[in-house]
């Protein structure tokens, strides 16, 4: 039995995530399975505002933005798995553990984001995340995200 790939285009992503330019860091979802995993891409362009200061002579995509891109991917997986937050709820990044940066990411690279759902306990979800460029891991981390009323 084969399973059809599930994808999301940018319009569908914007319907789920509250982030907008310059902070929307997921361009396309290439595959996902509810309550299991999500794969997405982030195209890194020299035209992004962070490159004016990080670093002008040798532009490098900030590691914290790689982690944020992975967190946004976890949000997409959570929303497709358990439903989008209510109007009085917020889904936010709660913690990062075991973050490792292995190679710099530069303009022209395409980040492949892979997040895996591990468990949910009292509204706090645990995920493993990996970011790759050309098949090589550039970043990995454990991410926790929380869904809370405000």
From Swiss-Prot:
<dbReference type="GO" id="GO:0006633">
    <property type="term" value="P:fatty acid biosynthetic process"/>
</dbReference>
<keyword id="KW-0444">Lipid biosynthesis</keyword>
<dbReference type="InterPro" id="IPR010084">
    <property type="entry name" value="FabZ"/>
</dbReference>
<dbReference type="InterPro" id="IPR029069">
    <property type="entry name" value="HotDog_dom_sf"/>
</dbReference>
<feature type="active site">
    <location>
        <position position="54"/>
    </location>
</feature>
<dbReference type="InterPro" id="IPR013114">
    <property type="entry name" value="FabA_FabZ"/>
</dbReference>
<dbReference type="GO" id="GO:0019171">
    <property type="term" value="F:(3R)-hydroxyacyl-[acyl-carrier-protein] dehydratase activity"/>
</dbReference>
<comment type="similarity">
    <text>Belongs to the thioester dehydratase family. FabZ subfamily.</text>
</comment>
<dbReference type="GO" id="GO:0009245">
    <property type="term" value="P:lipid A biosynthetic process"/>
</dbReference>
<protein>
    <recommendedName>
        <fullName>3-hydroxyacyl-[acyl-carrier-protein] dehydratase FabZ</fullName>
        <ecNumber>4.2.1.59</ecNumber>
    </recommendedName>
</protein>
<keyword id="KW-0963">Cytoplasm</keyword>
<keyword id="KW-0441">Lipid A biosynthesis</keyword>
<keyword id="KW-0456">Lyase</keyword>
<dbReference type="GO" id="GO:0005737">
    <property type="term" value="C:cytoplasm"/>
</dbReference>
<dbReference type="GO" id="GO:0016020">
    <property type="term" value="C:membrane"/>
</dbReference>
<comment type="function">
    <text>Involved in unsaturated fatty acids biosynthesis. Catalyzes the dehydration of short chain beta-hydroxyacyl-ACPs and long chain saturated and unsaturated beta-hydroxyacyl-ACPs.</text>
</comment>
<dbReference type="Pfam" id="PF07977">
    <property type="entry name" value="FabA"/>
</dbReference>
<keyword id="KW-0443">Lipid metabolism</keyword>
């Amino acid at each position: 039995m084969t399973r059809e790939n599930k994808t999301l285009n940018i319009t569908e992503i914007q319907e789920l995530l509250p982030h907008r330019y310059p902070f929307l860091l997921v361009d396309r979802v290439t595959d996902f399975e509810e309550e299991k995993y999500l794969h997405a891409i982030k195209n890194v362009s020299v035209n992004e505002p962070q490159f004016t200061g990080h670093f002008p002579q040798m532009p490098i995509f900030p590691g914290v933005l790689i982690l944020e891109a992975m967190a946004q991917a976890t949000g997409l997986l959570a929303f497709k798995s358990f439903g989008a937050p209510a109007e009085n709820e917020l889904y936010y990044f709660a913690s990062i553990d075991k973050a490792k940066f292995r190679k710099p990411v530069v303009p022209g690279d395409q980040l492949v984001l892979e997040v895996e759902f591990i468990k949910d306990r009292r509204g706090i979800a645990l995920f493993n995340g990996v970011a790759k460029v050309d098949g090589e891991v550039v970043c990995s981390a454990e991410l926790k995200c929380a869904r809370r009323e405000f």
